[in-house]
Amino acid sequence: MNKMNRLSHNTEIRNAIYSGVGIGISGNSFLLLFHIFKYIRGQRSRHIDLPIGLLSLIHLVMLIAMSLVATDIFMPWGRWGDTTCKCVISLYRFCRSLSLCATSLLSILQAVTLNPRNSCLEKFKRKSPHYMLGCLLFLSVFYTFISSPLATYITAKSNLTSPSFTYITTSCSLAPMSYSFHLTVFILLTSRDVIFVGLMLLSSGYMVTFLGRHKKQSQFLHITSFSLKPSAEKRAMRTILCLMSFFVLMYTLDSIVSYIRSIDDGQIFYCVHIFTAHGYATVSPFLILSTEKYIINIFRSTFGRMVTIILLRNR
């Protein structure tokens, strides 16, 4: 039996992956429904609400595709055909690409919203969510153009005739590529990652610098009108640092594991790669929800009522 096929009998890894995917789907579903509920109720929306809603939708679709991949790895019900392999694997890769783009654009948008109202970016600030939609649409078309040739190398195992095929799932594998094509895809995807991660780091650094400078100015001037702002600034800084830092951490780990897999494509590194690939999509909604005052107040109110009911029953 092939060592990769033994994954289907490893219940500990299977349960861990399914638990992580299930938690991520629940968190992103709740975050998406929360923003839909805010829109239906007509509550005042922030500039980042639409991008966060889009990011949660992207992660939701990505984790659903991941659950299908995990099912074919651990509990295959039947062999997938070429079309199913191409669609599921390509959808997962497409959502991962959009997650990177949306996170980078979200960090840029948050940096823009910190500028004062009389700045030159005020006009852009009002239309920035719509610009982000346009950027995501353009990037979607661009990535589809890049990844379409790559999808032709994803094939069902029933068609395999060479041991040089790379394992993806029980049903699917990646056919060997020519050196020139592999190098072209590598350069394009690496350039994309460097650009968007670089923009993310620059915008996050700008936000931290801006918030720190604003806090020092308010403390130096002792202006009472700023007395309510430090907590909001700290909360915004904490959200930015946590979300972007966690993304960079998971991206770095995923890149390291991907490189190791290119040398040793064993069972252990394959499983670690699964966790690092969807770790950000699983944790990010909870990082965002932890800073939503409205949700925190609901949980506090609900928890307080539950405690009161329990105390009354015990009397």
From Swiss-Prot:
Swiss-Prot/TrEMBL keywords: Cell membrane, Disulfide bond, G-protein coupled receptor, Membrane, Pheromone response, Receptor, Transducer, Transmembrane, Transmembrane helix
Main location as per UniProt: membrane
Entry GO MF terms: pheromone receptor activity
Bridged cysteine pairs (disulfide): 85-172
Subcellular location: Cell membrane
Record topological domains on the Cytoplasmic side: 41-51, 113-132, 213-239, 289-315
Gene Ontology BP annotations: response to pheromone; sensory perception of chemical stimulus
Lipid bilayer topology: Multi-pass membrane protein
Gene3D superfamilies per the UniProt record, alphabetical: Rhodopsin 7-helix transmembrane proteins (1.20.1070.10)
Family to which the UniProt record says this protein belongs: Belongs to the G-protein coupled receptor 1 family.
Protein name: Vomeronasal type-1 receptor 54
Species, as recorded: Mus musculus (Mouse)
